[in-house]
């Protein structure tokens, strides 16, 4: 049978999602925990690979197993073997044709950025940081140039393995919440798929515009250039969260977890 799991994790201590020889990745820790609980080797496929330092609120994976166990057993049993910064949120049987990556019709990410004269301490790794004030209207105006279908080569990492740089951005929302002497900014992105470092490179551009280094129209020029050197430097992975994939309702999978509610 095929099982889907919803996984949340803090990426700060890991070398990204994808398995490596070092064993210091989220995939390695999850597969080890699943294999120990199932007492047999288990390999998983994920909805979207995350970089080192990037967090996930609802990564979705699937795996095949001959074992018949209650979904609650997969959750509690696997969590018993996972480190404290990785947790299975839910488990659900799915049809054999379901694929965590191929069945996803969209993917969602959020960036949380602290605007403050002082760098974060307690929130280190959980938020990005800028010390110069940001202009929300300018960033929202600039973001309009990213909506719809575009060739996103200007935001593509050199090591990106995607077959095509053409993606469709369906949603960008920028909001803020004020605190004493600071502001938390939340940037949400939804697209059919993302290129390697695409969001981090877009964030570098949006923040440059928000800080007054470029006008909003500059982002349209960056898109049109289709060259990585036309864009701003890649922003830090701190504060980047994979919110999860979007599936058709017929799959009946959860669309969010409680962890969404504590993001600024």
From Swiss-Prot:
EC number in record: 5.4.99.12
InterPro entries listed in its UniProt record: PsdUridine_synth_cat_dom_sf, PsdUridine_synth_TruA, PsdUridine_synth_TruA_a/b_dom, PsdUridine_synth_TruA_C, TruA/RsuA/RluB/E/F_N
TM annotation in the entry: none
Keywords, sorted A to Z: Isomerase, tRNA processing
Keyword Nucleotide-binding: no
Active site location: 51 (nucleophile)
Residues annotated to bind substrate: 109
One function term, GO molecular function aspect: tRNA pseudouridine(38-40) synthase activity
GO biological process, one term: tRNA pseudouridine synthesis
Keyword Isomerase: yes
Pfam family, one: PseudoU_synth_1
Catalytic activity: uridine(38/39/40) in tRNA = pseudouridine(38/39/40) in tRNA
Entry's family note: Belongs to the tRNA pseudouridine synthase TruA family.
Function comment: Formation of pseudouridine at positions 38, 39 and 40 in the anticodon stem and loop of transfer RNAs.
UniProt xrefs under NCBIfam families: hisT_truA
Subunit structure: Homodimer.
Protein name stated in the entry: tRNA pseudouridine synthase A
Gene for this chain: truA
């Amino acid at each position: 049978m095929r099982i889907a799991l919803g996984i949340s994790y803090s990426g700060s201590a890991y070398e990204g999602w994808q398995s490596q020889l070092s064993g210091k990745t989220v995939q390695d820790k999850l597969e080890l925990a699943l294999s120990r609980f199932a007492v047999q080797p288990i390999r998983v496929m994920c909805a979207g690979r995350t970089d080192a330092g990037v967090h996930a609120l609802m990564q979705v994976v699937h795996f095949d197993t001959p074992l018949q166990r209650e979904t609650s057993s997969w959750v509690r049993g696997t969590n018993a073997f996972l480190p404290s910064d990785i947790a299975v949120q839910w488990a659900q049987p799915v049809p054999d044709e379901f694929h965590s990556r191929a069945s996803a019709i969209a993917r969602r990410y959020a960036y949380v950025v602290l605007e403050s004269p002082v760098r974060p301490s307690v929130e280190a790794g959980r938020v990005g940081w800028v010390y110069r004030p940001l202009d929300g209207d300018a960033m929202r105006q600039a973001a309009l140039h990213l909506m719809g279908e575009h060739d996103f080569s200007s935001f593509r990492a050199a090591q990106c393995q995607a077959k095509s740089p053409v993606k469709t951005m369906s949603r960008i929302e920028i909001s803020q919440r004020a605190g004493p002497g600071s502001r938390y900014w939340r940037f949400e992105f939804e697209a059919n798929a993302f290129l390697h470092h695409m969001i981090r490179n877009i964030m570098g551009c949006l923040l440059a515009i928000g800080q007054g280094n470029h006008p909003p129209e500059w982002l349209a020029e960056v898109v049109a250039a289709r060259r990585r050197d036309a864009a701003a430097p890649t922003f830090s992975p701190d504060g980047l969260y994979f919110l999860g994939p979007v599936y058709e309702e017929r799959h009946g999978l959860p669309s969010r977890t409680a962890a969404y509610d504590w993001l600024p």
